[in-house]
From Swiss-Prot:
Marked site positions, Stutter: 346
One GO process term, biological-process aspect: intermediate filament organization
Region listing for Coil 2A, in residue ranges: 261-279
Organism domain of life: Eukaryota
Name of protein: Desmin
Localization (cell): Cytoplasm, Myofibril, Sarcomere, Z line; Cytoplasm; Cell membrane, Sarcolemma
Gene Ontology cellular-component annotations: cell-cell junction; cytoplasm; dense body; intercalated disc; intermediate filament; sarcolemma; type III intermediate filament; Z disc
SMART domains for this protein: Filament (SM01391)
IF rod domain location: 100-408
Naturally occurring in which organism (per UniProt): Gallus gallus
Cited SUPFAM superfamilies: Intermediate filament protein, coiled coil region
Region Coil 1B, annotated ranges: 144-244
Function, in words: Muscle-specific type III intermediate filament essential for proper muscular structure and function. Plays a crucial role in maintaining the structure of sarcomeres, inter-connecting the Z-disks and forming the myofibrils, linking them not only to the sarcolemmal cytoskeleton, but also to the nucleus and mitochondria, thus providing strength for the muscle fiber during activity. In adult striated muscle they form a fibrous network connecting myofibrils to each other and to the plasma membrane from the periphery of the Z-line structures.
Pfam families associated with the record: Filament (PF00038), Filament_head (PF04732)
Length: 464
């Protein structure tokens, strides 16, 4: 807005001074006392966009303006010049010139400020580019390699722990199989023990039966002995009675010789009874001895079986105790292994959770670094856009300055030509041409996901 206002003031001042419409545009010229030309160089920036990335193009323009025409025209006038009108016009022109110098000084100050600002922004841009290059070359690769190495180490640890856990599980399964076999053997030994106890109970019943039979036989022997003693006593009493009767009847026997001999009969009877008693006693003793021998043999057999059963029972009891101790030891080992397995599972779960947290934290840091890089790239792009805008504004001010110089030089030439009413065309003026050399620099920056993928710079030279 201020630029347009200054430009309108300058145009209106020239209209007031020289009249007419807008001043024509001529190449930039400089006045000098000697007839030599001067060259003025200006830089025009052209902004073009390629692939959504702004680029900056610079046009360097060189203009050569002859200056001998004004000097020749002024010298060729001679004494015909009339300065009465020129003095009045020069006063107003000097006033306008002074105002324009003040405005040009302000423009120069603003231009210097813009140059300082551009230099500062270029320094900041260089710092940001260096920071982006440092972050691009340092952080992502090194952090990624470090994290990948740590992840590989964690995976190796997890694989080792998994193999160790598999070995522990195999050992646990083997111990469970051994424990199952021992339990099966224990059941078999318990069954054998029960069978031995049943046999022992049967043997005890046989021993009890044999003992009862022996007691019964002993009782029968005692009864037979008592019966034999009773029979002996009865026999003796009968013999005494018979002897008494024989003594009482002795006389009668003697007197009666023809009667049978009772003594011989009694002896025969006694002999018969004694033989019968002896036979019964012998049979009873033989039967008793046979029974006693049978019972003794049966008792010996039962005692041997009982001792064998007791010995087997002691062996089984020792085996049961040893198996019980072994089962208790295996149970303790199994409990310790299960406890170790639970502790290892808990530790592995905690380590896995820590590793997951570390991975999440590292991924978050990577995302943060990518966001920082994207932010730096956006800031770099914004600074580049600001720089291009400032370059465009500087080029605009330069055009305005050149336009002011051209506008100042052209009215003076017209004033001298109208006052002198003289027009001359010098060979230098006829031969002078405006040569424009344009250099186009195209800088292409390709970005992808906030990261700079490639940069390319291209220059084109054209002569107009």
């Amino acid at each position: 807005m201020s630029q347009s206002y200054s430009s309108s003031q300058r145009v209106s001042s020239y209209r007031r001074t020289f009249g007419g419409g807008t001043s024509p545009v001529f190449p930039r010229a400089s006045f000098g006392s000697r007839g030599s030309g001067s060259s003025v160089t200006s830089r025009v920036y052209q902004v073009s966009r390629t692939s959504a990335v702004p680029t900056l193009s610079t046009f360097r323009t060189t203009r050569v303006t002859p200056l001998r025409t004004y000097q020749s025209a002024y010298q060729g006038a001679g004494e015909l010049l009339d300065f009465s009108l020129a003095d009045a016009m020069n006063q107003e022109f000097l006033q306008t010139r002074t105002n324009e110098k003040v405005e040009l000084q302000e423009l120069n100050d603003r231009f210097a400020n813009y140059i300082e600002k551009v230099r500062f922004l270029e320094q900041q841009n260089a710092l940001m580019v260096a920071e982006v290059n440092r972050l691009r070359g340092k952080e992502p690769t090194r952090v990624a390699e470090m994290y990948e190495e740590e992840l590989r180490e964690l995976r190796r640890q997890v694989d080792a722990l998994t193999g160790q856990r598999a070995r522990v599980e195999v050992e646990r399964d083997n111990l469970l199989d051994d424990l199952q076999k021992l339990k099966q053997r224990l059941q078999e030994e318990i069954q054998l023990k029960e069978e031995a106890e049943n046999n022992l109970a049967a043997f005890r019943a046989d021993v009890d039966a044999a003992t009862l039979a022996r007691i019964d036989l002993e009782r029968r022997i005692e009864s037979l002995q008592e019966e034999i003693a009773f029979l002996k006593k009865v026999h003796e009493e009968e013999i005494r009675e018979l002897q008494a009767q024989l003594q009482e009847q002795h006389i009668q026997v003697e007197m009666d010789i023809s009667k049978p001999d009772l003594t011989a009969a009694l002896r025969d009877i006694r002999a018969q009874y004694e033989s019968i008693a002896a036979k019964n006693i012998a049979e009873a003793e033989e039967w008793y001895k046979s029974k006693v021998s049978d019972l003794t043999q049966a008792a010996n057999k039962n005692n041997d079986a009982l001792r064998q059963a007791k010995q087997e029972m002691l062996e089984y009891r020792h085996q049961i105790q040893s198996y019980t101790c072994e089962i208790d030891a295996l149970k303790g080992t199994n409990d310790s292994l299960m406890r170790q397995m639970r502790e290892m599972e808990e530790r592995f779960a905690g380590e896995a959770g820590g590793y997951q947290d570390t991975i999440a934290r590292l991924e978050e840091e990577i995302r943060h670094l990518k966001d920082e890089m994207a932010r730096h790239l956006r800031e770099y792009q914004d600074l580049l856009n600001v720089k291009m805008a400032l370059d465009v504004e500087i080029a605009t001010y330069r055009k305005l300055l050149e336009g002011e110089e051209n506008r100042i030089s052209i009215p003076m030439h017209q004033t001298f030509a109208s006052a002198l009413n003289f027009r001359e065309t010098s060979p230098d003026q006829r031969g002078s041409e405006v040569h424009t050399k344009k250099t186009v620099m195209i800088k292409t920056i390709e970005t992808r996901d906030g990261e700079v993928v490639s940069e390319a710079t291209q220059q084109q030279h054209e002569v107009l």
